[in-house]
UniProtKB/Swiss-Prot annotation:
GO terms for biological process: angiogenesis; animal organ development; blood vessel diameter maintenance; blood vessel remodeling; c-di-GMP signaling; cellular response to glycoprotein; cGMP biosynthetic process; cGMP-mediated signaling. It comes from Rattus norvegicus. This is C-type natriuretic peptide. It comes from the Eukaryota. Residues 24-73 form a propeptide. The gene is Nppc. The lineage of its organism: Eukaryota, Metazoa, Chordata, Craniata, Vertebrata. Residues 1-23 form the signal peptide. Its main location: secreted. It is found in: Secreted.
Length: 126
């Protein structure tokens, strides 16, 4: 197993073990996300009938701002974690350049050991 894959698995296990401890004890379960157009249309339709001075619970702009900021915050965290995992799981684009297996002049012996010049020319390497 490659070292990068081993590190990625270890990090995944570490993140999964930390995940339940980060959960807040009083948070309600997340609701399924709706498309952005419908999300904006529903609060405007519900809040359009209320007057400016109305102090009813659950209505008004404060709740709308809170919902929007929560959605944006969740989206931002999700994007950051996806980018981090993508960097961990994908090798460097020029990784082939750093691997020594495809360079000229690197002859491999019988057991993967590099043969010296004399052994490779005389055939006594194996």
């Amino acid at each position: 197993m490659h070292l990068s894959q081993l590190i990625a698995c270890a990090l995944l296990l570490a993140l999964l073990s930390l995940r339940p401890s980060e959960a807040k004890p009083g948070t309600p379960p997340k609701v399924p996300r709706t498309p952005p157009g419908e999300e904006l249309a529903e609060p405007q339709a519900a809040g359009g009938n209320q007057k400016k001075g109305d102090k009813t619970p659950g209505g008004g702009g404060a709740n709308l701002k809170g919902d929007r900021s929560r959605l944006l915050r969740d989206l931002r965290v999700d994007t950051k974690s996806r980018a981090a995992w993508a960097r961990l799981l994908h090798e460097h684009p020029n990784a082939r350049k750093y691997k020594g297996g495809n360079k000229k002049g690197l002859s491999k012996g019988c057991f993967g050991l590099k043969l010296d010049r004399i052994g490779s020319m005389s055939g006594l390497g194996c």
